Amino acid sequence: GEKEIEKYLQKAETLLNTEDIQRDGYYAFVCEKCAPVFGYYGYFLTEQDLKQRARNIYERA
């Protein structure tokens, strides 16, 4: 149900925000693909943040 989805979204956000993971092209790809899911469930700020992270990484490459 809805509570379970919220739990998974929070877990995903926590993992994506982990400081010691490498911010590379793979991370950018994951952010880009996950962002719309957060938006679909109303986490619009997280969606925008993930899209921006991906853009920043792609611009550096």
Model-derived segments and their meaning:
Residues 1-61:
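Intrinsic-disorder-linked linear interaction elements in eukaryotic regulatory proteins
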